[in-house]
């Protein structure tokens, strides 16, 4: 009603962070559950490289790159672990908008 509320389900005691924050949406300087976003992205790249090496996938490539901004640390982690050179063929130009979303206040 307008003057009260009813709890349908009590909140849990455990925090569950969406993996999308670590892999894409979270800023590099942010930390979730005590883990820095940039560090997690490097780790993800490292794990991908280890997986590819174990399965003999993508070993005959010239360089590793990521799509800016969030993909770059993944690629650096991959390159560092695999020994394959990192390169930046894509450079994102963002003079005013922090993310690739269309601003709601367009004029």
Give, region by region, the residue ranges found by the protein language model.
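PRPP-associated nucleotide enzymes
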Residues: 1-107
């Amino acid at each position: 009603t307008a003057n009260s509320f009813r709890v349908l389900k009590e909140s849990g005691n455990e925090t569950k962070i969406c993996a999308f924050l670590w892999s894409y949406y979270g800023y590099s300087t942010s930390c979730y559950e005590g883990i820095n976003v940039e560090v997690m992205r490097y780790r993800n790249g490292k794990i991908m490289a280890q997986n590819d090496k174990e399965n003999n996938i993508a070993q005959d490539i010239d360089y590793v790159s990521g799509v800016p901004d969030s993909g770059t640390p993944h690629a650096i982690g991959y390159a560092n672990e695999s020994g394959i050179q990192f390169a930046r063929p894509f450079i994102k130009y963002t003079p005013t908008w922090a993310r690739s979303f269309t601003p709601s206040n367009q004029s």
